[in-house]
Amino acid sequence: MIKQSPVKGKDKVKVSFILPGEAVTGTVSVVGDFNGWDPTAHPLRARSNGTRSVAVTLPAQHRFAFRYLDESGRWLDDDAAHGYEENGVGGVNSVVTT
C-alpha cells in the first residue's frame, strides 16, 4: 500500500510505503530510484497495527521505480503501485508517481 501527503510549503511529497505484517518475516526495505536501490537506506519498521512501513520524502510530480527487498534477497511487489514497468533484468518494478 502507498499513502501520500504533500509537504507543506515545499514541492515535495511524503510517501509512506506499507506492507502487511504477514507479507514477510525478518528485515525488509523499500529500494528504488530515489535511494540508489540501497537496501540499508529505508528499512520498514513494525507498527502497532501489524503492518510495516517507512516514510520517504520525494520531489513532487516525479515517477519512481521501486520494489521491496527482504533479508533473504527475495523481491516483493506492491499490489497498490501506481504502475509497473519492466526492469531490464527479467523482472518488473513497481512505480509510484508523486
Task: Please place each PLM-identified region on the residue numbering.
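Aromatic-rich carbohydrate-binding modules that target alpha-glucans
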Residues: K12-Q61, E71-T98
